[in-house]
Amino acid sequence: MKNLITTILLGCAVSVQAQTSTAHDIFSDTRIITSQSVETNWKGEGTFIISHRFGDIYQNDAYSILYNFLGFDGGANMRIGLDYGITDRLMIGGGRSGYNKTYDAFAKWNIMRQQSGDKNLPVAITLYSDISFISDTTNAVLDSFFVDRFSYAYQLMIARKFNEKLSVQIMPTLIHRNLVATKAESNDVFALGAAVKYNLTPVLAISAEYFYNLPGQLPAGFNDYSALGIDIKTKGHVFQIQLTNSPFLIPEYYIGATQGNIIDQDASGQFDLNLRLGFNITRDFQLGGRQY
């Protein structure tokens, strides 16, 4: 009788566990292209990240594409960063970008995971916030008040994995700059971002992201950020190759300071192409916590 009761209880436990399924790997990494994804590091997991954006591929004419070797000879921007999982749902990170010699720090908290079955949660939700600091000393305007060097970003990420191939995320975002260059710019910028990932194979995916800035917040010449990427996933590494209209690597800049649509016109009305090659390389490592 004892054995029978034990068997029944174990069977019920397995049955209940099997009735709830959590969606994993909604996106390939904690970044989609430049923007953050709902994914967070596991507890004790660290990630070293190098992000690089080259110069404009197209400069004045088609000849410049090869002359500047697809933008490799142009001005580039790079960010080196380090992330760490405090818990399985909370991660922190920081880095430095070459543009304005900017330092940034962020926190990201996954408050809900997508689940199906006995406990049905149709989406995953993650909160994100960061702070950035301009350390460049060549801009005399920033010398007036120390706090003028700070900017902030706040983001709500809502994502759904529809099947093993398709994932979608939306990102309502607010950025705040303590100092802006002109009166035509708003200190606060509201934007709505959207991203999609489609798995071609278990290790290869294509992704795209776009941020729409609400009208009346930025002066003429500033545009919405967009990007298209390819993700190559291996054990412990994710290599991402991108095409984007922005050289920037943190939301305060790629949302609030991107200039030029991908297909555009220059000041003289001639055809212009604002497109840059870029890449992200990530390396995961274990410092403690979860054992694999």
Question: What is the role of each PLM region?
Answer:
Residues 1-23:
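Bacterial Sec-dependent N-terminal signal peptides
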